[in-house]
């Protein structure tokens, strides 16, 4: 985690541009495993890691959100955003800039944006955002968020990932379960017409989540931004046009 606290660029476009850098090779140290060496080498050679440092983002993941929003335009000036599992804060930085949460031009409804980040981990403040050290599963968390927003949210974001085990199917099931829980929370706090964006892993059950979300959102799709590593099973589910709360909660829908 950095202490820069910068909002960073507003779009992430061209963030990896410039002259091509020489690749760094890392020797395996005596107390460093081969997998750790590969991870370190990948980080040192990752253009998005360098771009994040250059533009003041706390993580390379900021470019994933920026790229998705560049195409689908759901982070609008004046918007109210909830970021679940927000540490270290890269997505909050992007959201703050795009919804004008630090000031600037107000949105279409004459209001400035609002960004609420939730994480059970302690983290440095993000200028322009309200950070709560809170488990979003705790009782009353949804009501607390709506109170801080002075209404319902326009966007709910989740870049959360469950701790990995190294077993692909287990990791897939864990993150899909986490995504479903986040989706249920989203249906409790979103305003009609709202957007839900969450990380998932390919593994066999991701289409079941699409079917479930289509009952509550007008448009549901999978997206994979260029900032997601090509060899990763990671992708995102983007659900737009929330239909509003029904009598049947999302997790009871079939």
From Swiss-Prot:
Enzyme Commission number: 2.1.1.166
Note whether Coiled coil occurs among the keywords: no
Q: Where is this region: Disordered?
A: 1-26
Q: Where in the cell is it found?
A: Cytoplasm
Among the entry's GO cellular component annotations, what is one?
A: cytoplasm
Sorted alphabetically, which keywords does the UniProt record give? Answer: Cytoplasm, Methyltransferase, rRNA processing, S-adenosyl-L-methionine, Transferase
In this chain, composition skew of type Gly residues spans 1-18
Q: Does the keyword Lipid biosynthesis apply?
A: no
Q: Which residues bind S-adenosyl-L-methionine?
A: 89, 91, 119, 135, 159
Task: Tell me, in a sentence or two, what this protein's role is.
Answer: Specifically methylates the uridine in position 2552 of 23S rRNA at the 2'-O position of the ribose in the fully assembled 50S ribosomal subunit.
> What is the official name of this protein in its record?
Ribosomal RNA large subunit methyltransferase E
Species source reads: Parvibaculum lavamentivorans (strain DS-1 / DSM 13023 / NCIMB 13966)
